[in-house]
Amino acid sequence: MYNHKVVEKKWQKYWLENKTFKTGTDPEKPKYYVLDMFPYPSGKGLHVGHPEGYTATDIMARMKRAQGYNVLHPMGWDAFGLPAEQYALQTGNDPATFTDENIAHFKKQLQALGFSYDWDREIKTTDPNYYKWTQWIFEQMYKMGLAYEAEVPVNWSPDLGTVVANEEVIDGKTERGGYPVYRRKMRQWMLKITAYADRLLDDLDDLDWPEPIKEMQRNWIGRSVGAQVTFKIKDSDKSFAVFTTRPDTLFGCSYTVLAPENELVKEITSPEQKEAVDAYIKSIESKSDLERTDLNKDKTGVFTGAYAINPVNGEEVPVWISDYVLATYGTGAVMAVPAHDERDYAFATKFDLPIKEVVEGGDISKEAFAGDGVHVNSDFLNGLHNEEAKAKMVDWLTEKGVGEKKVNYKMRDWNFSRQRYWGEPIPVIHWEDGETTLVPEDELPLRLPKESNIKPSGTPESPLANLTDWVNVVDENGRKGKRETNTMPQWAGSSWYFLRYIDPHNDKALADPELLKKWMPVDLYIGGAEHATLHLLYARFWHKVLYDLGVVPTKEPFQKLYNQGLILKNHEKMSKSRGNVVNPDDVVDEYGADSLRTYEMFMGPLNASIDWDDNGPSGVKKFLDRVWRTFVNDLDLDPIPSEKITDKNDGKLDKIYNETVKTVTEHFEELRFNTAISQMMVFMNACQKVDKIPREYAEGFVKLMAPVAPHMMEEIWHVFGHDESVQFAAWPTYDASKLVESTVEMAVTVNGKKRGNFQIAKDASREEAQAAATALTHVKEFLEGKEIKKVIVVPNKIVNIVAK
């Protein structure tokens, strides 16, 4: 009887002690770098959703090793971040201790699932020897002018005591914890990701990534070509610029809208409108950018009392403020052409503002017309279609000095400051004379001081501001300074971790350039689609910066990306609050890690979201037990190969075996693990129907199944008499000539009635087929005393006999 508890522990211990999965370094072999998105080690541990992606990468790693590749398959921990700090605040425990305990638990769970990680390369982002290089990268960005300080409107969460990124705000509340968010201006460190916008966009074309992810990044970057136009304020020396993708519609501009935060608002608001404007600004303080720009929300706004001059025709147009205009996007001001823009139309209709048609083709009494058409009411643009009119208007604006062609991006620079304790310290000193300097490179890492009181300060400063011994510094000339007290966001450490795995213990460089050249880019990266516009975009940005510095040899970090789907319970995402979390430890205990791994790969396509079936693992366990009984005789204490295993080959399994090798190999390569496992089940069914199984085929099957169910296959491999791990056995190949049957089954009819079947060599002659048919006992009985008048042979199909 196969005992998964004993066998799995035995092989996990063996693999760990023998470093079976140490990264290969043979210079003659090709490389394969297969990577999981490293997890945040939360207090909850793994749930059954985690192993799905991890099993997929593990299958690829194990197959590629067997195919003769040097494989890099590492694991580490994205260990900074808010949850550990929140826990520390609530319990008074040190976040470092809490994090390390969680890591130990996660690691134990991963090892119990038999993943073939090279644990010698384990990293964690909270290790000073790791974040030394996170800080080093920040310093290079600072020197390149890509890291800068700015007073910017931010999403401030008083409850968390920190700023959160736009991407981390959902419906005016923080993604983690659901706390309210308010907009306020604060001094922040910013990273100039916008400087790389075009490259981040253009280089997507060369990546083997899911198209929806590429599209999400394209939309997030949001490149648009248009014009910047200057509007002067009436009776004032003030002016403002607007960005528009439709400069051709400038003659139809009937009002303008400024972002409520725009500095100009205070200066131009009339005394009569001041109260209404101030009240409106206060009312939108806690709204996130996403909420404010939602196309479906009801339009709100207030007239400032000021007018602007339309540069193209000298008309006076009212200046309004509205929350759908963001200070951080474009210029923080828009020109409104309600006849030809849906949002402007809704706003104009609500506030009874003029709607002027300048492009023919729609019915503006009913809705805005945004399509192509002939320009009207547009002076020198009349009669032109959209594209010609745009070009002509840009030329006119440029010539008159009131505008120019402009490219704009929806993406903003990355807010890189967090007012928290548990993050990488930013290696900067602010001196009393106003100078800002970097901590010298030879003094890195700038370590996070150990501290028990990590309550948020409630100000734009992090809890580090309370640690005066750490904060206050004096240089050799007696000049006083203060360390930067903001820390980096959790995204920092994950923006380059895939590089550190290549050379994790190097204290002289981020990684050896020769090793980077050998291993980059990552060949296969598997993780959740939720990281499309955060981690994946940030990692590409950092990688391009390092490429420009000559640190990395490739423009892109991840050549192929694949998103696994969610594992649901009762058609809902698993979460503690819903009480529907399935713990993998329980499944492993009852059915074994091999059953869990095989079930998760067999459930359905890897990229689909699928409902967990509590009976699934037991069904898979029955299949694995059948594999064991087919190949192993364990009636005595020492298991031996089954009596069915033979060194002879009668050819009965030739076709199905070679078909299985071909299908499994191809489907693994295509990450179609469910259909590959189906094919292995088909082969096992065929094995049940024969008396003998050629040893070569039994061993070939074990090699094919080993990446999915490694513990049982390792055990069977050793029962078959091998000393080395099945991991080092060459991957099976198939014989194409055996993919076709060498024999066929033919039917026999006598006088139109079927009287039997027989096996015969494929493409046998008519004479051979007739002889075989008439030799059948059953047929002989029907032919007795009759004369055969006619025999019709349909090759490989049927023998028709007419007898009287």
UniProtKB/Swiss-Prot annotation:
<dbReference type="Pfam" id="PF09334">
    <property type="entry name" value="tRNA-synt_1g"/>
</dbReference>
<dbReference type="Pfam" id="PF13603">
    <property type="entry name" value="tRNA-synt_1_2"/>
</dbReference>
<dbReference type="GO" id="GO:0005829">
    <property type="term" value="C:cytosol"/>
</dbReference>
<dbReference type="GO" id="GO:0002161">
    <property type="term" value="F:aminoacyl-tRNA deacylase activity"/>
</dbReference>
<comment type="similarity">
    <text>Belongs to the class-I aminoacyl-tRNA synthetase family.</text>
</comment>
<dbReference type="GO" id="GO:0005524">
    <property type="term" value="F:ATP binding"/>
</dbReference>
<dbReference type="InterPro" id="IPR001412">
    <property type="entry name" value="aa-tRNA-synth_I_CS"/>
</dbReference>
<keyword id="KW-0030">Aminoacyl-tRNA synthetase</keyword>
<dbReference type="GO" id="GO:0004823">
    <property type="term" value="F:leucine-tRNA ligase activity"/>
</dbReference>
<keyword id="KW-0436">Ligase</keyword>
<dbReference type="InterPro" id="IPR025709">
    <property type="entry name" value="Leu_tRNA-synth_edit"/>
</dbReference>
<dbReference type="InterPro" id="IPR002300">
    <property type="entry name" value="aa-tRNA-synth_Ia"/>
</dbReference>
<keyword id="KW-0963">Cytoplasm</keyword>
<dbReference type="InterPro" id="IPR002302">
    <property type="entry name" value="Leu-tRNA-ligase"/>
</dbReference>
<dbReference type="Pfam" id="PF00133">
    <property type="entry name" value="tRNA-synt_1"/>
</dbReference>
<keyword id="KW-0648">Protein biosynthesis</keyword>
<dbReference type="InterPro" id="IPR015413">
    <property type="entry name" value="Methionyl/Leucyl_tRNA_Synth"/>
</dbReference>
<protein>
    <recommendedName>
        <fullName>Leucine--tRNA ligase</fullName>
        <ecNumber>6.1.1.4</ecNumber>
    </recommendedName>
</protein>
<keyword id="KW-0067">ATP-binding</keyword>
<dbReference type="InterPro" id="IPR013155">
    <property type="entry name" value="M/V/L/I-tRNA-synth_anticd-bd"/>
</dbReference>
<dbReference type="InterPro" id="IPR009008">
    <property type="entry name" value="Val/Leu/Ile-tRNA-synth_edit"/>
</dbReference>
<dbReference type="InterPro" id="IPR014729">
    <property type="entry name" value="Rossmann-like_a/b/a_fold"/>
</dbReference>
<feature type="binding site">
    <location>
        <position position="576"/>
    </location>
    <ligand>
        <name>ATP</name>
    </ligand>
</feature>
<keyword id="KW-0547">Nucleotide-binding</keyword>
<dbReference type="InterPro" id="IPR009080">
    <property type="entry name" value="tRNAsynth_Ia_anticodon-bd"/>
</dbReference>
<dbReference type="Pfam" id="PF08264">
    <property type="entry name" value="Anticodon_1"/>
</dbReference>
<dbReference type="GO" id="GO:0006429">
    <property type="term" value="P:leucyl-tRNA aminoacylation"/>
</dbReference>
<feature type="short sequence motif" description="'KMSKS' region">
    <location>
        <begin position="573"/>
        <end position="577"/>
    </location>
</feature>
<feature type="short sequence motif" description="'HIGH' region">
    <location>
        <begin position="39"/>
        <end position="50"/>
    </location>
</feature>
